[in-house]
Amino acid sequence: MCGIFAYLNYHVPRTRREILETLIKGLQRLEYRGYDSAGVGLDGGNDKDWEANACKIQLIKKKGKVKALDEEVHKQQDMDLDIEFDVHLGIAHTRWATHGEPNPVNSHPQRSDKNNEFIVIHNGIITNYKDLKKFLESKGYDFESETDTETIAKLVKYMYDNWESQDVSFTTLVERVIQQLEGAFALVFKSVHFPGQAVGTRRGSPLLIGVRSEHKLSTDHIPILYRTARTQIGSTWWGSQAERGKDKKGSCGLSRVDSTTCLFPVEEKAVEYYFASDASAVIEHTNRVIFLEDDDVAAVVDGRLSIHRIKRTAGDHPGRAVQTLQMELQQIMKGNFSSFMQKEIFEQPESVVNTMRGRVNFDDYTVNLGGLKDHIKEIQRCRRLILIACGTSYHAGVATRQVLEELTELPVMVELASDFLDRNTPVFRDDVCFFISQSGETADTLMGLRYCKERGALTVGITNTVGSSISRETDCGVHINAGPEIGVASTKAYTSQFVSLVMFALMMCDDRISMQERRKEIMLGLKRLPDLIKEVLSMDDEIQKLATELYHQKSVLIMGRGYHYATCLEGALKIKEITYMHSEGILAGELKHGPLALVDKLMPVIMIIMRDHTYAKCQNALQQVVARQGRPVVICDKEDTETIKNTKRTIKVPHSVDCLQGILSVIPLQLLAFHLAVLRGYDVDFPRNLAKSVTVE
């Protein structure tokens, strides 16, 4: 949800103007995550000596768009933008309000005191902040914001002020602080007491570090440094030694930091580091990144990056690899489209091909999902499949449940992650649990993953983000390869998740003779799918015309059944998300159990009727709607002459195999939602109150 970006240049001279441009551009790359205010923190002096400037931190914060922050930056009269810094750390943040309304005081960076001794940017929610705040207030600390994050900044200062020895490291302070935090967080700290140093950490919220240098790096694998003795701080530290200032540095030794345990350029010291919530903010600067794990503390001191952990646990990986991103900058740019959402809708012919590339062999009718290959026999022996997700990803599970049940002959449950957790759903060792998330960081889905792992189930991730928490923590998985999706309303990720689950179903039954004809039928449908999607997209003008007739309405009902119930749910969600119209996806079989009361001549109704096993029942529902003076728009098969003849308004889509038809029927609804939002004057990519990556529960 919130966006974190920080930039540290070490012996790479940069003017303050260049530093600010880098920070602002980083925030712009994170805008798609959703936000309501933004801010930056940087060295504030105007001396020629960077160390003198680092003794003062300047904060600039603004409600609204990043563009408004950029304008505010250039209004600052006391900042010389042409001052050059040989070493500098700047931190920046886009805030999504969770505690306190959107305003400059509540925006990040949050500060420890009026002198800005410590500042911090934060993505997540601290659940015990009220207890921490109460303690700090009892010690005389005054709070100016309503945020949970300010508690973190003041907690660092409290630790620093009460540390008896003067040689405490920034890393040690942060380690002590995160021991007291409950909830989810990704944090980056800056301090006047530790000029040119950056410390970042995460727990339950993503954080990565990009590295850029003209010179060879010392290693491609950074070893983890562990504390050599147990800390004396307890689970609650008020009243402990830390409070009394007696917790000396010697009570908790730190593994040695030297040339064998750090990342740095070998030949020269010049290096740049980029801390970010996700890769889209760093890809234009570097493709070499380190993904932090929960409770990692990453520190840059004297241009050297080291990674620390407080304690060693079973299964810990001994280091963090420097990975190479395959993403390219042009993939996250709009190109000739007016919005990212429009671009992503029209990318679907290519994105479904990318999802299938190298996995589906149309010559010998085989499917090979490399990420599942080593576990497929175990999955085939399971007692049931559980698909766990939120929002659009949940709808992808609903859309493919029927074909999964048909081809695997296993019971398939599709669960909303939040409800799954609320019910303490029974999970067994012979269950296989799928976790579907575009970002791979969805908080409820991630909590569901950990819940299922504790109970011994095999876990499978289906994500669009390499290195995400879900992709790392699952036993195996499928990367959907849809490419970066920036628009908050998911489009191409939905169709790629759909195709990925169908491919999994095909892989599960490849050795069943009774299924071979059905497998071939579905695989031929997959082969034709990109061309059929292009055909649907060619109807854009027709759908735009329909939008001009509907955009002034306050509500719309979308009805269907069978394979298309999920299409109704997903279409209704898209309309809700970006047009702010009330919309409801209705199972046509439930029409007489309540929803029919809503139908009259004024209520816009969209029905999905395809030539599959539910055709006759859908026709019956259509007649019931018409009998109540409803005037439905019907999305139907272009070869369905009966429906076309008997219905005043139709959207005719090409025919495909029944279990893939939902991909072709959802695209008109994606286009309709887009055009409705544009006609109603709303920002399609950044709908109000919503975020792309929901990293808090």
From Swiss-Prot:
Enzyme class: transferase
Induction per the UniProt record: Expression in the liver oscillates in an ultradian manner (with a 12 hour period/cycle).
Reactions performed catalytically: D-fructose 6-phosphate + L-glutamine = D-glucosamine 6-phosphate + L-glutamate
Stretches the record annotates as Isomerase: 311-678
InterPro entries recorded: GATase_2_dom, GFAT, GFAT_N, GlmS/AgaS_SIS, GlmS/FrlB_SIS, Ntn_hydrolases_N, SIS_dom, SIS_dom_sf
GO molecular function terms attached to this record: carbohydrate derivative binding; glutamine-fructose-6-phosphate transaminase (isomerizing) activity
Pathways per UniProt: Nucleotide-sugar biosynthesis; UDP-N-acetyl-alpha-D-glucosamine biosynthesis; alpha-D-glucosamine 6-phosphate from D-fructose 6-phosphate: step 1/1
Domain of life the protein comes from: Eukaryota
Domain SIS, first and last residues per copy: 375-514, 546-687
UniProt xrefs under Gene3D superfamilies: Glucose-6-phosphate isomerase like protein, domain 1 (3.40.50.10490), Glutamine Phosphoribosylpyrophosphate, subunit 1, domain 1 (3.60.20.10)
Residues at which substrate binds: 392-393, 437-439, 442, 593
Residue ranges of domain Glutamine amidotransferase type-2 in the record: 2-303
Residues in coiled coil: none
CDD domains the UniProt entry points to: GFAT, SIS_GlmS_GlmD_1, SIS_GlmS_GlmD_2
Listed EC numbers: 2.6.1.16
Purpose of the protein: Controls the flux of glucose into the hexosamine pathway. Most likely involved in regulating the availability of precursors for N- and O-linked glycosylation of proteins. Regulates the circadian expression of clock genes BMAL1 and CRY1. Has a role in fine tuning the metabolic fluctuations of cytosolic UDP-GlcNAc and its effects on hyaluronan synthesis that occur during tissue remodeling.
Assembly description: Homotetramer, may also exist as homodimers.
Name the UniProt record assigns to this protein: Glutamine--fructose-6-phosphate aminotransferase [isomerizing] 1
Species, as recorded: Mus musculus (Mouse)
